[in-house]
Regions:
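Structured surface interface patches that mediate subunit assembly and partner/cofactor docking
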Residues: 1-7, 27-31, 36, 59-69, ...
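Hydrophobic alpha-helical core bundles mediating ligand binding, dimerization, or RNAP-core interactions
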Residues: 13, 102, 106-113
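Helical hydrophobic small-molecule/effector-binding pocket
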Residues: 77-83, 109-116
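A short, structured beta-strand-centered segment in the mid-to-C-terminal lobe
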Residues: 82-104
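Conserved alpha-helical segments that form or flank metal/cofactor-binding pockets of metalloenzymes
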Residues: 44-84
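Alpha-helical bundle segments that constitute or directly flank the non-heme di-iron/ferroxidase center
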Residues: 1-24, 45-59, 104
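Amphipathic alpha-helical interaction segments
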Residues: 42-45, 167
Length: 211
């Protein structure tokens, strides 16, 4: 089963993976990512970690009401220490095979994704629609693709696919409205808004960040 979200997710991964190859990301693997103690090598490993979650997805129990995407991603912060520890462990485990290891994880993720036929699935944080689950994976790629770009200011081109940024910005706008009761003041261009929503840029808004 595949639809437009599947296509967009693959497009963003393909764009990001090509960018990582073009910039020879392993030359920069020890550079700080701007995300706590993570290096860019850790961030590469985290891409595989995030997409590999597709292999864990199952159909939600019959009658399960899907969560909104906003509620789902709002449950991320408590898990952050565990995710950080597991990501660093994965990066160390992959070692010099970092990119090949991530490629293998993504190949497994795509095979699993194509087998997901249920309209409501069960992710780590609860049930949500299949499309919204894929959107959480797209959000990861867009946010972290931008993290790579900001950590490498000498590289002009961004790895973020414009259509993917628009989709993620729209989803985060809906999540903001659900939380605050009003739409965000400004969401275009999409990347500055995504940085605010993801906590990459500080804001006095008490409803931010969203994840």
């Amino acid at each position: 089963m595949e639809d437009q979200m599947d296509v967009l997710l693959e497009r963003q991964w393909d764009g990001l993976r090509s960018w990582l190859a073009e910039v020879d990301i392993l030359r920069y693997r020890d550079r700080a990512s701007g995300l706590g103690t993570w290096t860019l090598g850790d961030l590469v490993a985290h891409l595989g970690y995030g997409l590999r979650m597709l292999t864990e997805v199952t159909a939600a129990p019959a009658g399960a009401a899907p969560m909104s995407l906003g509620r789902y991603v709002g449950a991320y912060p408590p898990a952050a220490p565990t995710i950080a520890e597991q990501t660093s462990g994965l990066a160390a485990e992959l070692g010099d095979d970092l990119l090949r290891g991530v490629d293998a994880m993504v190949a497994d993720a795509w095979r699993a994704r194509r087998q997901i036929s249920a309209s409501v699935v069960l992710g780590r944080r609860g049930p949500l629609t299949r499309d919204d689950y894929l959107l959480t994976r797209l959000l990861e790629l867009v946010v972290h693709g931008d993290d790579f770009h900001r950590a490498l200011p000498e590289i002009q081109a961004s790895p973020v696919v414009p259509d993917a940024a628009v989709a993620v910005a729209g989803a985060l706008s809906a999540a903001y409205e659900e939380r605050s009761g009003r739409p965000p003041t400004r969401t275009t261009p999409p990347l500055p808004w995504i940085r605010l929503a993801a906590g990459r840029v500080s804001s006095p808004d008490p409803h931010l960040p969203l994840l």
